[in-house]
Amino acid sequence: MKQNEDSLLREKLKEYFGFSSFKGNQEAVIRNVLSGKDTFVLMPTGGGKSLCYQLPALLMDGVAIVISPLIALMKNQVDAMRTYSNDAGIAHFLNSSLNKSAVAQVRNDVLEGRTKLLYFAPESLTKEDNVAFLRKVKVSFYAIDEAHCISEWGHDFRPEYRRIRPIINEIGTAPLIALTATATPKVQMDIQKNLGMSDASVFKSSFNRPNLYYEIRPKHDVDREIIRYIKQHEGKSGIIYCLSRKKVEELTGGSVVVDVQASGVLGSENDVLD
């Protein structure tokens, strides 16, 4: 029987996402979600966390509520899900960027059963009209992405994340899956306690990246060293982290990096919420 179940799950993976096999703990996590149990996932960036709730959402009755901290992340995931389906209503997000007409269309798709994944920022989830709407909906499970934002001990603490559990209680309880790529044991305990999922099944993946190495060098004429290093690796891409916006602008504005294609991303550009 288990062999048939394994085969069926892989068939669905291939059908919906085009993959022939799962990565790491993905299959075990998905089975736990499908069984209706609370799930805590600690998995490195690039490990395939999103699939751990996307595939179960497609296979279960109802709509999965996905809570994510940034509009850009939600939009990217919704766009990606729509490429896997002929129905654009398969995934939606609800936030302040939508006008009344767009919100009405999203809610209609959800009520008609077309939508399997509905994304919210925590600030949007807590709005009274959204809570009232979701009370009418059959929720398959709740997925809390970037769950470290819940913990005051975490580096990206978001106060609204700590309101998620009370709001879930208002909407209607369902299994939870919390996912993060960064959580110390202390942060993990805080997440599980705050979400009321202390008995959750825990899945931890290895963070070892054999293709990466760390090297520490004394600082001597840093700008010259950066230029030399870039030119030694011609045709390749890299990321330079700076401690200030000013330094990013200096490096990418032409005063330091000469004859090198460069672009800068400032911290504030990633801080787009709700």
Predicted regions and their residues:
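Conserved Rossmann-like nucleotide-cofactor binding loop
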Residues: 72
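Intrinsically disordered, low-complexity N-terminal extensions of nucleic-acid-metabolism proteins
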Residues: 1-2, 118
